[in-house]
Regions:
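Buried hydrophobic packing segments
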Residues: 56-64, 169-172, 176, 333-337
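Acidic/histidine-rich catalytic neighborhood of metal-dependent amide-processing enzymes
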Residues: 55-137
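Zn-dependent metallopeptidase/amidohydrolase metal-coordination segment
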Residues: 279-377
Length: 379
């Protein structure tokens, strides 16, 4: 218990040799006050369907731990409930990292660092959606906190004595927008953020402004390239205004890669449970998930199941078909695990032997290497 502060893990061993398969479910909700099922106090709502995906894990566990099923399997199972996939309260997470309570930004990333996945050979999870499919990949991302330090002054009497931090921020954002043509299409680069700080009073030249930015891309190299370009834009305005800028980098998630052999297993089971229903492969998602981190070091499945309607992360994302959302999803995940561990677990052994892009050490080195603080101006 207490994995990545809020995570949980339970293990079941068949008593016969074979791979250890992890079945994952995500715990966190989103702050969506207008969602019809939002909590009255916290405004949290399952507007990404994690409750249904966690239900799939629990339903899968209920089936696989039955003696008549477990006796036909080899190897072992780890059921892992993972926190903090949505990365919502970024300052809070950053404070936990600074206090030494966490090492990395995402829940699964932290579990990797803690060694929770050290004994896992294959990892699988499903996610709620409006269709059955497996993506070809996801973007990874780095979180950037851009702090613009100017100089306060009376905004009416003598603004010439100040350095307006908002005026520093504006051309920095324009320069970032001008960089978009330099991003390769296949890199799927996304730059997006918001302004949490921008002054305290209308008649004071703001001496501090903050822009929180997420840089997403399809590979660690593309993330680094886009991140470096943002840094140069921020450096340029520090020089131009004679102020100071600070860039705080915390690496978020790695890109997700798909394993065709594991997707093959899942596709067969989806089509057995929902014959005639559409199933799609190869959809690239420019969003991000910390399952990408797991996929870097362990053969992984991140499939989607139907049963929801509306737009994820909004107030209209709701269960449209309870059978599909809660029952079929659990069946799919259970059948995937059974296929991997059935008999002598030969299928699972083959998938466990697939080559991954990184080992744990390389992964941690890259994650920590991205995290840094840079300052520009006033040398």
């Amino acid at each position: 218990t207490g994995l990545a502060i809020k995570g949980r893990r339970a293990d079941v061993d068949t008593g016969r040799p074979g791979p250890r398969v992890a079945i994952l479910g995500e715990l966190d909700a989103l702050i969506v006050p207008q969602h019809p099922f939002a909590d009255a106090t916290t405004h949290a709502a399952h507007a990404c369907g994690h409750h249904a995906a966690l239900n799939a894990m629990l339903g899968c566990a209920e089936v696989l731990t039955r003696p008549e099923v477990l006796s036909q399997l080899s190897g072992s199972l780890a059921f892992i409930a993972t926190p903090s996939e949505e990365c919502q309260n970024q300052p809070y997470i950053a404070s936990l990292i600074e206090a030494g309570k966490l090492q990395l930004f995402g829940g699964k990333s932290e579990l990797i660092a803690e060694g929770v996945f050290d004994d896992i050979d294959v990892a699988m999870m499903l996610h709620a959606g409006g269709a059955n499919y497996t993506p070809s990949g996801f973007n990874g991302f780095v979180m950037k906190r851009l702090v613009f330090h100017g100089k306060s002054a009376h905004a009416g009497a003598n603004p010439d004595k100040g350095v307006n931090a908002i005026s520093m921020m504006r051309p920095a954002l324009t320069l970032m927008d001008a960089q978009r043509d330099t991003f390769r299409d296949e890199a799927h680069v996304r730059l997006h953020g918001y302004i949490p700080e921008g002054g305290e009073a209308v008649n004071v030249v703001p001496d501090r402004a903050v822009f929180t930015l997420q840089v997403r891309a399809a590979s660690p190299e593309a993330i680094q390239d886009a991140s470096d370009k943002v840094d140069r834009c921020v450096k340029a305005v520090a020089i131009a205004f004679g102020g100071e800028t600070e860039v705080q980098n915390i690496f978020g998630f790695m890109p997700l890669i798909a394993y065709d052999e594991l997707d093959d297993v899942h596709q067969r089971n989806v089509q057995a449970i929902a014959p005639g229903a559409p199933f799609t492969r190869g959809i690239y998602r420019p969003s991000s998930t910390d399952m990408g981190d797991v996929s870097m070091i362990i053969p992984s499945l991140h499939g989607y199941f139907r049963g929801f309607a509306g737009t994820a992360h909004t107030d209209d994302f709701l269960v449209a078909d309870a059978q599909q959302a809660y029952v079929d999803s659990a069946k799919m995940l259970a059948m995937d695990a059974i296929d991997l561990l059935w008999g002598d677990a030969s299928c699972g052994r083959k998938i466990a032997a697939l080559k991954c892009p990184m080992n744990k050490q390389t992964y941690l080195e890259k994650m920590r290497g991205f995290s840094s603080t840079l300052t520009f101006g006033k040398d």
